[in-house]
C-alpha cells in the first residue's frame, strides 16, 4: 500500500547549487537574504568549483567567486556542505519506503530503484522549497501506481562473467529503450551486482531516460511488484549491447584528459583506482 504523504518528506538534496547560469546564484542569494532556512536534513550536490582550493587551482576569479557564493548561500540556509552527487553513499542513506525530496537524476534513480525510498525527480528551485517545508507534491513515484514498470525489457544471451564495464553500458542502453517510462529488466538474476554496479546502472540510465527509476529482477527491492497492465515488452540482446559499446568507443585514439567521478566514486572504487594506477595530481 502507499506509504507516503506530502507531510512526511524526511530529507532533501539540493541540485540548484551548480552555477549553470546566473539565475541559480540570484535565486539562492535572494532566498538566503530573506532568511530562508531548511527544516529537514538537506545535503548539497557537487558544485562547480573546489570550494576550498579554486583560487590555488587558477580558476577564473569571476567564475570561482560566484560559484563559491552560490554554495555558501545554501550552507547559510542550513544545508549540509556535503557537495556530492551521490548522497546515498553517505553514512545514513534513506530507508525503504522513506519519503524524501531529492533532486539530481542519478541520486533520485538510485534512491527509488535500489534503496526503495520514494522521491520525485525534484527540479531546481523547487528542491529548496521542499527542504524549507518538508513537503512535496504527492504524485508520481510517491505512490505505488507511479512506481509500476511500464515496459518489460528482456535481456537475452548475457554471460554471467561480466566486468565493471557492463553495468553502465546496460543502463545507457536500457534508457534508450525506455526513454519516457519505468522499465523492468529481466534476465540478469544470476549476475552478481554490488553497490557500485547498481550505481553505474542508475547513473547511465539517467543519461538516456527521463524516468525516475527502474526495476531489475533479482537486484532491486520492488522488482516483484505487478507491472502496469498496459506494459509492453522489448528485448535487448548481446549484439545490441556490443553495438552500443562500439558507439561509445568511436572517438579518436588521442586522449588528453580522463575525468572520473560522475557520480562520485565510492570508497571501494577510489581504493581500487589508487592501488592499480599511478595518480598524478
Regions found by a protein language model. Give the residues of each.
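Glycine-rich phosphate/ribose-binding loops and adjacent secondary-structure elements
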Residues: 228-272, 281
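Short, small-residue-biased leader/transition segments that mark boundaries at the very start
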Residues: 2-5, 273-277
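Extended, H/D-rich, highly charged conserved domains that either
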Residues: 162-219
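Intrinsically disordered, low-complexity linker/loop segments enriched in Gly/Pro
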Residues: 93, 125, 131-163, 167-169
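General beta-strand structural signal in soluble alpha/beta enzymes
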Residues: 9, 38-42, 81-85, 118, ...
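N-terminal basic/disordered segments at the start of proteins
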Residues: 1, 6-34, 119-123, 130-135
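A generic, well-ordered mixed alpha/beta core segment in the N-terminal half of proteins
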Residues: 44-134
Amino acid at each position: 500500500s502507499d506509504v507516503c504523504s506530502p507531510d512526511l518528506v524526511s530529507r532533501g538534496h539540493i541540485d540548484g547549487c551548480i552555477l549553470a547560469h546566473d539565475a541559480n546564484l540570484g535565486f539562492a542569494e535572494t532566498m538566503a537574504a530573506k532568511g530562508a532556512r531548511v527544516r529537514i536534513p538537506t545535503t548539497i550536490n557537487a558544485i562547480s568549483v573546489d570550494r576550498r582550493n579554486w583560487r590555488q587551482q587558477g580558476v577564473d576569479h569571476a567564475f570561482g567567486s560566484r560559484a563559491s557564493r552560490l554554495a555558501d548561500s545554501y550552507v547559510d540556509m542550513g544545508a549540509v556542505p556535503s557537495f556530492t552527487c551521490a548522497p546515498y553513499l553517505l553514512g545514513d542513506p534513506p530507508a525503504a519506503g522513506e519519503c524524501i525530496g531529492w533532486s539530481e537524476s542519478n541520486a533520485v534513480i538510485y534512491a527509488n530503484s535500489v534503496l526503495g525510498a520514494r522521491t520525485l525527480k525534484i527540479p531546481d528551485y523547487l528542491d529548496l522549497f521542499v527542504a524549507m517545508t518538508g513537503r512535496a507534491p504527492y504524485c508520481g513515484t510517491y505512490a505505488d501506481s507511479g512506481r509500476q514498470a511500464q515496459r518489460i525489457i528482456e535481456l537475452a544471451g548475457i554471460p554471467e562473467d561480466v566486468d565493471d564495464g557492463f553495468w553502465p553500458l546496460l543502463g545507457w542502453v536500457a534508457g534508450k529503450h525506455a526513454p519516457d517510462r519505468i522499465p523492468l529488466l529481466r534476465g540478469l538474476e544470476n549476475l552478481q551486482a554490488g553497490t557500485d554496479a547498481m550505481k553505474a546502472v542508475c547513473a547511465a540510465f539517467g543519461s538516456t531516460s527521463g524516468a525516475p527509476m527502474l526495476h531489475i529482477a533479482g537486484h532491486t527491492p520492488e522488482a516483484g511488484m505487478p507491472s502496469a497492465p498496459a506494459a509492453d515488452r522489448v528485448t535487448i540482446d548481446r549484439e545490441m549491447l556490443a553495438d552500443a559499446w562500439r558507439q561509445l568507443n568511436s572517438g579518436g585514439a588521442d586522449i588528453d584528459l580522463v575525468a572520473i567521478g560522475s557520480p562520485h566514486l565510492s570508497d571501494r572504487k577510489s581504493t581500487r583506482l589508487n592501488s592499480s594506477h599511478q595518480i598524478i595530481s
